[in-house]
UniProtKB/Swiss-Prot annotation:
Cytoplasmic membrane side: 1-23
UniProt entry tagged with the keyword Membrane: yes
Highest taxon in the source lineage: Bacteria
Compartments, record wording: Cell membrane
A Pfam match: POTRA_1
Domain POTRA residue range list: 45-113
Protein name as it appears in the record: Cell division protein DivIB
Gene3D superfamilies: membrane protein fhac (3.10.20.310)
Membrane topology, record value: Single-pass type II membrane protein
Biological processes annotated in GO: FtsZ-dependent cytokinesis
Entry's Gene Ontology cellular component terms: cell division site; plasma membrane
Role according to the record: Cell division protein that may be involved in stabilizing or promoting the assembly of the division complex.
Family of this protein: Belongs to the FtsQ/DivIB family. DivIB subfamily.
Amino acid sequence: MSKDLISTDEYIKIKKKRKRIKKIVVLFIFLISILVTLCLKIPYFNIESIEIKGNVNIPKEIIKDSSTIKTGNNIFYTNKKDAIENISLNPYIEEVKITKKLPNKLEIYVKEREALFYNKVDKDFFIISKNGCLLEKRKEIKNMKLINLQGFEFNESKIGSALKAKDERGVKILNDFGVLLKNNASDVIFTQLDLRNLLDIRIYSNGICVKIGTSDQIEKKLNTAINILKRDELKKAKKGYVDVSYEGNPVFYIEK
């Protein structure tokens, strides 16, 4: 009998405890709901400033406008995914990150693609990034200091995408060259890269043809060629070649 009474008492206590917990949970949810509603409604969380970082050539206003985020919008309503997708539609944008700085600031960081190559098709210049992305078509390239590129299906390529090539290895080789040429700190200026034959790759410095051969050890071959091209007799040369395509001592020839 006493055991049954004790069990009943314990049951009542447990039931009361559960009711208290339930009330606390309901109250907590209610308070959270009020807090969320306030955050979404009060002006304290309205965006006051949008800071653009990382842009070099693309104006800040273009990035802001393409994001479709406006000052005055509630920071919690801001859809970062949509904004990133909108900004990334610009072919010159390689990467986008958006950070919310509570209570009312937004930071948009962009990494731009850099134009390095070009090819002329009919009256249009195709502008290409260092990693082989077609950035735009334009009518002139004055003062852009780009390298002429050969060996791709330019007319079949789409703006914002990698160049089309008959041999897919071409894009990878172009990317390798792009990194090396962008980091070239010497005074040697390259004017054309010919990837039409991947077994006989050639790069030109004005009238001097550098025979690279295959894509093996591109960095070593290019550095060797640069050191040769820095020699006085080659700086003055108008036509000739430097052959670094094979193992052993490189050969150069200056046309008289």
